Amino acid sequence: MKNLYSANQKGLIIYKTKHKQTGRRHDYKIYKENRPDTPKDVESIVDLGFLGVEKDYPEQISSLPIKKKKGNQDLTIEEKEYNRIHSKKRIVIEHAICRLKKYRIISEVFRNKLRKYDMVSDIVSGLVNYRIMNSI
């Protein structure tokens, strides 16, 4: 199963896509099919799996890391610093996904009926959000 998650800067999961049964899918393709309606003033901090989001959705504020150029050219100091700042913002969503995967029903093979997967992942997302809200 593959879902995409969005989280705010506190780590609360604010959006989750429905699962796809068709096997391997690229993150950006799932994003284009299930794009959340984010306000125009909200920045989307994404990883390199979403190359093309700035071109396809110019009205949306999005932040991608800078990709290393072809050949043996290293990034400049400014580009490395930008990527470091981007990673500090991005780690919040990675930690949210990690919290989800602590529940074995999400991280391992789903052994129930597939039609129940979205409900189960919604429940786990709610539990993760509940724990975060009670620890703040």
Where are the regions that the model predicts?
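Short, well-ordered secondary-structure "scaffold" segments embedded in the functional core
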Residues: 1-136
